[in-house]
Amino acid sequence: MRPVTDLQRRVFPFEVISDFTPSGDQPDAIAQLTARLQAGEKDIVLLGATGTGKSATTAWLIEQVQRPTLVMAPNKTLAAQLATEFRELLPNNAVEYFVSYYDYYQPEAYVPSSDTYIEKDSSINDEVERLRHSATNSLLTRRDVVVVASVSCIYGLGTPQEYVDRMVRLRVGMQIERDDLLRQFVGMQYTRNDLSFQRGTFRVRGDTVEIIPVYEELALRIEFFGDEVEAIHTLHPLTGDVVRAEEEMYLFPATHYVAGPERMERAIAGIEVELEDRLAELEGGGRLLEAQRLRMRTTYDIEMMRQIGTCSGIENYSRHIDGREPGSPPHTLLDYFPEDFMLVIDESHQTVPQIGAMYEGDSSRKRTLVEHGFRLPSAMDNRPLRWEEFLERIGQTVYLSATPGPYELGQSDGVVEQVIRPTGLVDPEIVVKPTKGQIDDLLAEINARAERDERVLVTTLTKKMSEDLTDYLLERGVRVRYLHSEVDTLRRVELLRELRTGVFDVLVGINLLREGLDLPEVSLVAILDADKEGFLRSGTSLIQTIGRAARNVSGQVHMYADSVTPSMALAIEETNRRREKQVAYNTERGIDPEPLRKRIGDITELLAREDIDTKELLAGGYRQAGSKAPVPRKAGGDGSMRERLAGAATADLAELIQELTDQMHVAAGELQFEVAARLRDEISDLKKELRQMSAASA
């Protein structure tokens, strides 16, 4: 159910603004994709090699077709990167970011073998929640919208029609009593707070009402003259400075799960009927413990809903609140899009299997809760979409991947290729070498690269082999580090930066060297045990690993193997095919491959930035993703943390901890998770220091 008839969406053109123009394979890929979409093809695959500019191609495609677009990514990090790229390419359009708003999430679960019940525990990121509301607000009010989302967009989001029905439309000159408007705000789950003015609250001063919508950072001022809306202004909530005057505004509810008193009463009646039936079933089967457990929990939840309109875990009653039939699919972000939206699935070889697996992973946990009396059977309908339900809700789809999976290849009538890089870089040369003497050969290759100030990645099959190889190379004087699953996210980022800057020359890892590493300084990728068939040595994994050497003019891949497996043959054949095409293109046009120049500070430069200037926010209207969060100087930049703290008084240390804690929350709110993680670690170290100082003075 898409509420497309209830609102008139504003129409603005999609427009790419960039210093670059399509080059390499991009013009042909854009033309083919556009033609096939306009011809009505439902599934199209863009086979784009690493570094060919698939994101830019997607932006130019959106500009060509002029349709609202959902871009799905396999994880939050990649979604954030894509959102930033699209915001740079489409600065005048609404580029939104929609991912799970949990910083931390422990779902409710029950382990029968140990009779252990685990309560739901979570920490919600307010800024991500704002961005989710901003996405639905944009989708319902304008057409020039690109939403970059993780797979969480197929989870229940509340009924879009109820969301629209509860919306308030404000227009200069309209007639409405002030108190009626305030009651509508309360019904939309906004809270009156005349002292602390923040997102999701409103305040009243005579004939002036001010409110901060949950999806905005700026406030809205509504000025009355009697019962007439005299003026509407957008203003800065802190300074009160007016940003612009408005003629008309849509104000949406403070929650996607909005329900009026009548709907809630109907829901409670349905819950009570279901509870009675389920209790009779459990007691009839002699399961008195489960029946008592369910009775206590559900009657408590019902009482909470009657008294305050909500309860812990209210999403488990969403079927009753939405008025859906048993087994029917939930409403999701997809229902907020217009009918003609386009879907782009990035890294489709990863994302498509994720979409298909979400339902079963969720239902197996809930099934246990229902079976043992922790939840009513209707809780099973608080779930993500099944695969077939997902397919029913999407239209034309473009799959992006360097290694498309079997599903998308089977759905598409041939692929659109994009293998020529704008920089002229070609895929690396692949050399297959015997395993006998492989370590000595690898050592010689490493030394040769180190002399040329180039870097090396080595991928192994097991943790023990990685550790042993790292120890061996260290003994031989090689500057080497080991990247493994126990290294936290921030340290992983630092290791990659140190590799690029030349702090060390070799990075050894297992499965951490596939997607997502952009390392132009790496000229050699060594794959040990390349002939051991399996997940880590599949054709897809090998092609992705080979791509790590595709950013360097002299990139090479050495596969150590005693035989050529089908997966190796596939990866070698595909890489050579791309390489031949790239070399021929360069030769024909006289192009010399250019080294990829990427600033090394890209990943960690946030560690040295200062506080946000409030005037920037006012001038820019609202902060874009990627704005600067206040962070401390990077540890080590002017001495270690311990040196900086030498001689500090206990009070000073406590003040510093509080300051860093505030900065950590701001960084998390700005989605700078690596920065927040670093601050968290520094705070932990400081607290240990404070405890030691307190103990010494006691």
Swiss-Prot record:
UVR domain residues: 654-689
Gene Ontology CC: cytoplasm; excinuclease repair complex
Domain named Helicase ATP-binding: residues: 35-210
Primary location: cytoplasm
Binding site for ATP: G48, A49, T50, G51, T52, G53, K54, S55
PROSITE patterns in alphabetical order: HELICASE_ATP_BIND_1, HELICASE_CTER, UVR
UniProt keyword annotations, A-Z: ATP-binding, Cytoplasm, DNA damage, DNA excision, DNA repair, Excision nuclease, Helicase, Hydrolase, Nucleotide-binding, SOS response
Motif residue range(s): Beta-hairpin: 101-124
Keyword Cytoplasm: yes
Residues of the signal peptide: none
One of the GO BP terms on file: SOS response
Record SMART domains: DEXDc (SM00487), HELICc (SM00490)
Source domain of life: Bacteria
GO molecular function, one term: excinuclease ABC activity
UniProt cross-references to InterPro entries, sorted A to Z: Helicase/UvrB_N, Helicase_ATP-bd, Helicase_C-like, P-loop_NTPase, UVR_dom, UVR_dom_sf, UvrB, UvrB_inter
Domain remark in the UniProt entry: The beta-hairpin motif is involved in DNA binding.
Subunit structure: Forms a heterotetramer with UvrA during the search for lesions. Interacts with UvrC in an incision complex.
Family: Belongs to the UvrB family.
Protein name stated in the entry: UvrABC system protein B
